[in-house]
């Protein structure tokens, strides 16, 4: 590893939530750069380069560290530092092993790094939770201890993936030193077999244009992987419909088949409750390769699985119908719902959908209008208040094709 120590004082702009970009290799704020070299489908090298980071000074005198694209670690009572993950495609049965080949860092003297309040659920007001400072603040060690680690493998329809998490910023509270890794190079290769989420079975007609597009954006090594080349096609779609709405939904089904998306509609009464629906969907997935499910009816008419974890325990979960393979939460099927209570609602949804797809009007003004809704809470992503985050999104939209983006923000929104 290469080491550099820089003794410097960070001069922050005064004011509420003042934020300063600290350059390591890049003058302007930018997301880290990922590059990869696929030596084979069982062996890949990855480079991670960080050009700088933000220091946000909070009203309580504490400082928050972030960088573009990073997310907080959410370990309660530990220094609130950012991390970033990227997924790679891995062999169906392999155990992958990671080693660090290169790591360059810079040390900055810095104190008063804020702690994390942990992973708060939506029913908890962050302002009601006090900051705590745990064991990491009393230990003469850099936190987090690992700058790179791998999560468990997962399955996404026809491919098996694994997320690699980079934690390029560490903090030693005793030495009051912030360590920033500007460059990390790792090697990931197969080493034996894994018992965690092996990919043992694929659906029939597994090619799907929509999922191929997801793979290309989601996996760092997708474009360099030839093992999973398939003849891609659209769909198919399964419509599970409340019986009283079947006739009203038929034009939608006919249209989808007409445009080349094989679509089948089934009365939910012929299937049963959520357990029976899950079993029915699994059969359709492996036998027909369905890529879409559309539920038609409200929750009392088309039930969904319920789980008892976190806030909103026992709440219905439509997306759970799409989890077919493995014990992860990556979908094999995309799930949607026409949440209709009566046929009038269904007619509206069917007509709007068909008209939108058949008669697009790219010159219409509404295509170029948007609205942003934000609370007065924060800081969150990139150390930004909610309204600041929405303003950044608004700037991006206005710089693209949008002409109007409303700002509906607390407390006046």
Segments (PLM) and residue ranges:
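Sec-dependent N-terminal signal peptides
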Residues: 3-14
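Short secondary-structure capping/junction motifs at helix and strand boundaries
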Residues: 4, 288-292, 364
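Extracellular pro-sequences of secreted precursors
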Residues: 18-295
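Generic domain-boundary/flexible-linker signal
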Residues: 175, 304, 381-383
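A domain-level signal for caspase-like cysteine endopeptidase catalytic cores
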Residues: 237-265, 331-413
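Short, conserved secondary-structure transition motifs
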Residues: 272, 297-303, 377, 412-413
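Hydrophobic or amphipathic alpha-helical targeting/insertion segments
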Residues: 280-320
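Metal-dependent DNA phosphodiester-chemistry modules and their immediately adjacent helices/loops
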Residues: 309-343
């Amino acid at each position: 590893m290469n080491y550099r120590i820089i003794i410097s004082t960070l001069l922050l702009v005064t004011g509420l939530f003042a934020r300063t970009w600290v350059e390591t290799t890049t003058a302007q704020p930018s997301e880290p750069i990922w590059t990869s070299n696929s030596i084979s489908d069982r062996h890949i090298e990855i480079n991670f380069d960080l050009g700088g980071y933000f220091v946000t000074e909070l009203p309580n005198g504490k400082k928050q560290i972030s960088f573009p694209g990073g997310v907080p670690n959410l370990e309660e009572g530990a220094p609130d530092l950012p991390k970033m993950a990227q997924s790679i495609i891995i062999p169906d049965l392999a155990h992958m092993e990671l080693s660090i080949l290169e790591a360059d860092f810079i040390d900055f003297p810095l104190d008063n790094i804020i702690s994390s309040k942990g992973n708060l659920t939506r029913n908890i007001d962050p302002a009601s939770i006090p900051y705590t400072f745990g064991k990491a603040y009393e230990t003469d060690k850099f936190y987090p201890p690992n700058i790179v680690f791998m999560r468990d493998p997962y399955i996404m329809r026809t491919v098996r993936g694994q997320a690699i998490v980079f934690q390029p910023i560490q903090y030693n509270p005793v030495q009051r030193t912030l360590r920033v890794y500007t460059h990390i190079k790792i090697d990931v290769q197969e080493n034996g077999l894994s018992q965690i989420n092996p990919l043992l079975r694929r659906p029939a007609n597994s090619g799907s244009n929509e999922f191929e597009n997801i793979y290309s954006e989601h996996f760092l090594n997708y474009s360099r992987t030839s093992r999973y080349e398939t003849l891609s096609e659209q769909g198919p779609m399964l419509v599970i419909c409340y019986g009283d709405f079947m006739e009203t939904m038929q034009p939608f089904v006919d249209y989808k088949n007409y445009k080349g998306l094989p679509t089948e509609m089934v009365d939910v009464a012929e299937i049963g409750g959520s357990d029976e629906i899950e079993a029915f969907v699994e059969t359709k997935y492996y036998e027909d390769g369905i890529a879409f499910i559309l539920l038609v009816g409200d929750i009392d008419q088309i039930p969904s699985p319920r789980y008892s974890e976190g806030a909103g325990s026992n709440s219905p979960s439509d997306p759970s119908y799409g989890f077919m393979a493995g014990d992860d939460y990556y979908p094999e099927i995309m799930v949607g719902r026409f949440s209709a209570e009566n046929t009038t609602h269904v007619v509206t949804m069917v007509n709007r959908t068909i008209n939108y797809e058949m008669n697009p009007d790219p010159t219409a003004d509404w295509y170029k209008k948007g609205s942003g809704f934000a609370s007065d809470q924060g800081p969150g992503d990139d150390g930004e208040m909610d309204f600041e985050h929405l303003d950044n999104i608004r700037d991006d939209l206005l710089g693209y094709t949008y002409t109007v983006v409303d700002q509906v923000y607390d407390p006046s929104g």
